[in-house]
Design a protein with these regions (language model features):
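N-terminal secretory signal peptides that target proteins for export/translocation
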Residues: 1-6
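Sec-dependent N-terminal signal peptides
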Residues: 7-24
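Cofactor-binding active-site loop characterized by glycine-rich and histidine/acidic residues
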Residues: 13-15, 34-39, 61
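Sec-dependent signal peptide cleavage junction
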Residues: 23-39
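Mobile, glycine-rich extracellular loop/lid and propeptide segments
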Residues: 41, 45, 49-85, 131-147, ...
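A post-motif C-terminal structural segment
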Residues: 61-67, 77-82, 87-121, 125-129, ...
Length: 485
């Protein structure tokens, strides 16, 4: 098992060099003192910036024929998550370690830092604003700059161009990432106001977002306002489950499938659409516009799992998001005029594959078997237990492992506190210890994240780039599309 190697060529040598040098740069390259002390790092940074700039200029000369842009964000999906996902999907019967769909389309990395006086590690709002509007800003900002002035987003530019637009998320559709593409607010927590923006802010007399699919019903149906009724009056379809989504044929649709965020992929009922199903539904509707479309898709809860240090949920969400990415790629392959870019906003949790054993010795191993043994997330099991379910029965029903008496006892002791978080943590601890999964934080981490691409113009997103360049490139593409009409 541990002698597996890659036997396929993943990326060109130049790109491999880009990543190798990119790993040297890290966040310290932005510390002037460190850069002066390490001139080789500064040189590496300059080299990679030049390589990226050359790729951008070359593709601009070629003026690729792009009609649609699909931009996917795996929230919290740092490099360790990609490695873990590769181990999870590997075929143990083959000598090589198979590539994931992500691996097949790897093109570069991006930096993620915000422009915040107090914090140099980004949150989702600042990162999404950088990728949607091309400007650095403070943590918590929703498409506004440090002066709290609105920043135009690529989604808004697409709508100005006469294109159809869509947002898909497994969180509330008003959460930080989708909000930073379709709304403006000084703070991400103002999700009711963000929902209002989705309806109230018009472009050329039209609602700026044609397809909204995700969670967050509570932000749309409130005592002061029922936005679902307002959207329906304006011709939108309104759906609340997978069956209704499939049945509905409206080009404009509001789909709210949970009061808050959707359940984790492994926990979802059959009547809740997956990220893949929402993505396919959005593409089908948006593609009816002869002027093209812009779609942002977020795999929101990779991040939530990382905050919770829950490896079961994290791997479940990675699988869900990869299927959405593949759906976008499959459409682009048939369409020939669609650019697909996938990346992350940051990494979450400080996930490590391999950790210390109980004696403090480092374990040179990471095991997927305990993770694959889970039928549900620890969070799901904790909710059942807090609602009165028997601890041992719940664990044995949802974990296909022979549990140790001390593991069961640890959850029983947590259950005696009537604290759902402590129960959840006790169950997560079983999977983390069994799989040798480590975590350093319940927050975000500051490393670069991977970028993946397919379709015409993908080279503009290759090499080492900053997250603001995602928006800069898309704005350029949208302008060229407008001129080429």
């Amino acid at each position: 098992m541990f002698k597996k190697v890659f036997t396929k060529k993943v990326v060109p040598f130049a790109t491999v060099t880009t990543i190798a040098l990119g790993s040297l740069i890290g966040v310290t390259v932005y510390d002037k003192v460190e850069a002066e002390q390490q001139p080789q790092v500064q040189t590496a940074k300059q080299t990679q910036n030049a390589m990226h700039a050359e790729a951008v200029e070359q593709i601009k000369k070629e003026n690729p024929d792009i009609k649609n842009v699909i931009f996917l964000i795996g929230d919290g999906m740092g490099p360790s998550y990609m490695t873990a996902h590769r181990y999870m999907t590997d075929n143990p019967k083959t000598p090589e370690r198979e590539l994931t769909t992500f691996d097949e389309h790897f093109i570069g990395v991006q930096t993620t830092y915000p422009e915040d006086d107090k914090e140099n590690i980004t949150d989702s709002a600042a990162a999404a604003t950088a990728m949607s509007g091309g400007e650095k800003t403070y943590n918590n900002a929703i498409a506004v700059d440090n002066d709290k002035s609105e920043i135009k987003t690529v989604l808004e530019q697409a709508k100005e161009n006469g294109m159809s637009t869509g947002l898909v998320a497994t969180s509330e559709i008003t959460h930080a990432t989708p909000a930073s593409f379709g709304a403006h607010d000084h703070h991400r927590d103002n999700m009711n106001e963000i929902a209002n923006d989705y309806y109230d802010e018009m472009i050329n007399g039209e609602h700026k977002i044609d397809v909204l699919l995700g969670g967050g019903k509570k932000n749309f149906i409130r005592d002061d306002r029922d936005l679902t009724q307002e959207f329906e009056k304006d011709g939108y379809g309104y759906v609340t489950n997978k069956k209704e989504l499939v049945k509905n044929k409206d080009e404009q649709v509001l789909g709210l499938f949970a009061d808050g965020g959707l359940d984790k992929a492994i926990d979802r009922s059959a009547n809740t659409p997956s990220a893949e199903e929402m993505t396919k539904s959005a593409i089908k509707r948006l593609n009816q516009n002869e002027n093209g479309f812009f779609l942002m898709v977020e795999g929101s809860q990779i991040d939530w799992a990382g905050h919770d240090n829950d490896v079961v949920a994290a791997m479940s969400e990675m699988d869900d998001f990869e299927k959405a990415f593949k759906a976008a790629i499959d459409f682009a392959k048939k369409d020939k005029h669609t650019l697909v870019i996938a990346t992350a906003d940051h990494s979450t949790g400080g996930l490590s594959l391999g950790t210390n054993d109980e004696s403090g010795e480092g374990i040179y191993n990471w095991s997927t078997a305990p993770i694959k043994a889970a039928k549900k997330t620890p969070d799901f099991m904790a909710k059942q237990i807090i609602n009165g379910a028997d601890v041992e029965k719940t664990l044995k029903q949802n974990i296909k492992l022979k549990l140790k008496p001390e593991e069961i006892e640890s959850v029983k002791q947590a259950a005696q506190t009537n604290d759902e978080t402590k129960i959840d943590n006790a169950i997560e601890d079983i999977f983390n210890k069994r799989s040798y999964t480590g975590w350093t934080t319940s927050g975000h981490t500051g490393e670069e994240v991977d970028v993946y691409g397919y379709g015409p113009g993908k080279e503009m997103f290759s090499g080492l780039m900053d997250n603001t360049e995602q928006a800069e490139n898309i704005f350029y593409i949208l302008e060229q599309m407008k001129q080429n009409k």
